[in-house]
Amino acid sequence: MSNIVWHQHSVDQAARAKLKGQNPVLLWFTGLSGAGKSTLAGALERALFEAGFHTYLLDGDNVRHGLCKDLGFSVADRDENLRRVGEVAKLMVDAGLVVLSAFISPTREERDSIRARFPEGQFIEVHVSTPLSICEQRDPKGLYVKARRGEISNFTGISSPYEAPLSAELTIDTSKGDLASQVRALIDYLTAIGVINPDKAKALA
């Protein structure tokens, strides 16, 4: 690695963000399977996109079709999965995008490691705190049933722990309220911290 030198480009993040008229950021949605991470992140992305924002949604299932298709679900492979996603998200934020990532990401150490890659204010942790009982009732992929039968090992929430964030920027329980109000809460927060400027916020009203 000693012979590898970082090449500084003439176009930087600030210039890319200025061209797009937005402040780049990573919103990291974490929570149990079935908590509503992908649904919430997808609804927020749709709202931002329709208001003219340049966005990209990284989804836990989708990256395993390509970027991480060589990985399994051992502890080491899950760590590597998130490491890769964190690096991709960093590149996308550097490109000036508003990036949304929806991953169980069960440990604080994993999430804090990804946060550490970003400048202050460019990593926003969104804890989708829907209770296990509700997630298990939803079970959209039938995974909880399989985990209870012992057909899936190391399943987060059943046979493997989930460490809830201690100080997430936002906490949303999708079993309370409707999707529109939950997206509104996210938009209001992004406006309050300056990710969304007031003029563009009007388009999201």
Swiss-Prot record:
It holds the Pfam family APS_kinase. It catalyses: adenosine 5'-phosphosulfate + ATP = 3'-phosphoadenylyl sulfate + ADP + H(+). Pathway: Sulfur metabolism; hydrogen sulfide biosynthesis; sulfite from sulfate: step 2/3. Belongs to the APS kinase family. This is Adenylyl-sulfate kinase. PANTHER family: ADENYLYL-SULFATE KINASE 1, CHLOROPLASTIC (PTHR11055:SF63), BIFUNCTIONAL 3'-PHOSPHOADENOSINE 5'-PHOSPHOSULFATE SYNTHASE (PTHR11055). The gene is cysC. Its EC number is 2.7.1.25. It comes from Shewanella sp. (strain ANA-3). ATP binds at residues 31-38. GO terms for molecular function: adenylylsulfate kinase activity; ATP binding. The active site is at residue 105. Catalyzes the synthesis of activated sulfate. Keywords: ATP-binding, Kinase, Nucleotide-binding, Phosphoprotein, Transferase. The keyword GTP-binding does not apply. Transmembrane segments: none annotated. It comes from the Bacteria. It is an enzyme of class 2 (transferase).
